[in-house]
Swiss-Prot record:
InterPro entries: Cell_Proc_Reg/RNA_Proc, FHA_dom, OxygluDhInhib_OdhI, SMAD_FHA_dom_sf. It comes from Corynebacterium diphtheriae (strain ATCC 700971 / NCTC 13129 / Biotype gravis). PANTHER family: NUCLEAR INHIBITOR OF PROTEIN PHOSPHATASE-1. Residues 29-38 have a biased composition (Low complexity). An essential component of the PknG signaling pathway. When unphosphorylated, it inhibits the activity of 2-oxoglutarate dehydrogenase. When phosphorylated it does not inhibit 2-oxoglutarate dehydrogenase. This is Oxoglutarate dehydrogenase inhibitor. NCBIfam families: oxygluDhInhib_OdhI.
Length: 143
């Protein structure tokens, strides 16, 4: 007997998943870059965002440009595909060795450590919320 129901085949996208010990350290507030054997430390002078909660939990985004865009627009550097995210939601800006998140007029706002922010200089371990995505910021060693 055939299992054909007339429904089209569904393609599934996958992302990398972190070790359970690393996720526990991130949730407890410990610096993810200090995890023993951690492979999530970004290169010197760069930063990284790790999706802690959201449809693509575990995905990593390297912040190695002066400006990195995040939003629902397919041309965003960090593409977050969900209706709770504005097309052009936020920018991550690197300047003078530090990183800042700037809300660029989103509908639902950008949060840092669960507080609404128009802009905020980030520290390693900060949690940035864009729509229903929660991303942990990890800062690489100083260049």
């Amino acid at each position: 007997m055939s299992d054909n129901t007339g429904a089209p085949d569904v393609q599934v996208e996958t992302t990398s998943v972190f070790r359970a010990d690393l996720l526990k350290e991130m949730e407890s507030g410990a610096g993810a870059a200090t995890a023993s054997g951690s492979d999530v430390t970004p290169p010197a002078g760069a930063g990284m965002l790790v999706v802690k909660r959201g449809p693509n939990a575990g995905a990593r985004f390297l912040l190695d440009r002066p400006t990195t865009t995040a939003g629902r627009h397919p041309e965003s550097d960090i593409f977050l595909d969900d209706v709770t995210v504005s097309r052009r939601h936020a920018e991550f800006r690197r300047q003078d060795g530090s990183f800042e998140v700037v809300d660029v007029g989103s509908l639902n706002g950008t949060y840092v450590n669960r507080e609404p922010r128009n802009s905020e200089v980030l520290s390693s371990g900060d949690e940035v919320q864009i729509g229903k995505f929660r991303l942990v910021f990890i800062e690489g060693p100083r260049a």
